[in-house]
Amino acid sequence: MAHNQHHKDTIHSLFFNPLIESYPLSDSPFDCPDLSDLDFLKLGVSRCMSAARSGNDFLQTYRKDDESRVRVSNFFEALKSPRRLANLTSVNALLKPYMADHLPDELAAIEELKNWHLYAGDGHYHKAAVFDPKTKANHSSKEPSKSPTGHFFRLDLRTQHLGYLDLAQPDDGKKSEHDLKMLKRQDLETLRGNAPKGHKAFYLWDRACIDYGFWAKAKAQKGIYFATLEKSNSVTTFIREFSIIDYDDCRNEGLISDRLVESSAGYEIRQIVYIDPATGTEYRYLTNEKTLPAWVIVLLYKHRWDIEKTFDETKTKLEEKKSWASSRNAKKMHANFICLTHNLMLLLEHHLHKTEGMKDEVEERKQVTREKTRHKGTGFRKNLPPSYINRFFQRASQRTFRFIRWLRDGLSRRTSYRQSLRDLAHTWGCPVP
C-alpha cells in the first residue's frame, strides 16, 4: 500500500492513515460529491470518538478536512446506504491483514498454533434508537417497549482486530436472539474469515454456542473448531483418557485431565479439566479440536475474556451504548464503525510505542499497585508465582481512559503531531520523544 507522505502533520492524519491506505482496495467505492466515502468513514469513526450525546450534537461542531460541515440529513441518509455499508465492511476487513503486518503476535511463539485463525466470539447489546418502534412480547401482560439492538462480534486473538458478524434477528415477540441461531445463519466461509486453504479457524465462545452437530458440520466442511465451558447440567459419559499430563512441563500447571467423553446426543467431545493455580477455581472445557495440547486450549479460552474487555472499552470509555438510528443498515453501520474505531486506536497506540518509544508509565505504576492488592487465593496459593498460562500475554486488553481522552482532544482540535506527542507524554508520564 502506498505510504501517505503527510500522515504526521497532525495526530488526526496519523490516526486515519491506515484507513486511507486501505480504502483503494475496498469494495463498492463511489465518488460522491456531497460526502465522499473517505469523509464518511472518518465521520463515523469521529462520531464514535466524540463525547457528543447525539448525532445532532456531534454534527453541530464537526468539520470535514476542508472545514465544511456535514448536513444532518446527509449523515443519516448515508447510514441507510447498502453500498456504503458494503464499503465500510470491506475497509474494516482490510484492516485485519493490515494489523497482522503492523502489530505483534504474541501467539506466534506457540509453534502448535501455526496456520490457526483464532477468534473470541460473543454478542453485545445497545439500547434502542430514539425512533425504534415499541413491541410487545407474545402472551405478555407488560406494556409494549423498545427492544435492544443486538450485535455479534469476533475478536482476532492474534492482533485484537475486532470484526462484525451480524445483527441479531430475534423471533417475533422476543427481545434477543440466541448466539447459536445467529451462528447457524452464517455462511461457513464467512466464519472461516476467508482463511487460506490448509488453515483452520478456532472459535472460543461462551456456553451459548453448544450444539455438537453444528460444530461437527463446520469442522468437516470448513475446518472450523470450537471450545467452550461445560454447562453445569451437562450429561457426559467418560470414554477414555485422551492424553497423559506431563507435569514436568511447566505449561501444564493446573491441568487435571484431558479426556474424551460422549454427549447425551452421542457426539464424541474432548473434555479438559483445569484448576487455576492462582485461585483454585475449577474449569471444564469442551472442544472438538484433537490436535492441540490441552494447555494451549486453556490458554486461548482464558483470553476469550479479551472480547468482554473490548466491549467494556466501547461501552464505558467510548460511551457507545445506544443505537444511532432505526434501520437495519444503520445499526450494522454503527457496529462496524465501532470495530473500525477500536482497530484504528490499536494501530495508533502501537505506532506511538514502536516509532516514538512512548509508553503509559502511569498505567504501569497502577498495574504494580493492583498486583500487590489483587486477591491471589488463600493458603499456599497466595505465594505461588504466576503460572505459564496466567503470565503468557503481556499486552493490554483495552485502551485506557487517558489515551482515549487525549486522542479525542487531538482529533477534535486537529492538534499538530509534535504538540500531540507533548500532550501524550504529559498524560502518560513518559519522556517527550
Region spans (language model):
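A short, flexible helix-boundary coil/loop motif
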Residues: 1-26, 32-34, 243-274, 278, ...
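Active-site-proximal, Lys/Arg-enriched surface segment
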Residues: 76-157
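Short amphipathic alpha-helical "interface-anchor" segments enriched in bulky aromatics
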Residues: 297-325
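A conserved active-site cap/scaffold subdomain adjacent to cofactor or substrate pockets
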Residues: 280-307
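Short, amphipathic alpha-helical "recognition" segments used to contact nucleic acids or chromatin
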Residues: 40-52
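Short, charged amphipathic recognition helices of the HTH superfamily
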Residues: 49-64
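An internal, acidic/charged active-site-proximal segment
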Residues: 91, 167-281
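Short, conserved catalytic/metal-binding motifs centered on acidic residues
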Residues: 43, 58-59, 70-76, 116-126, ...
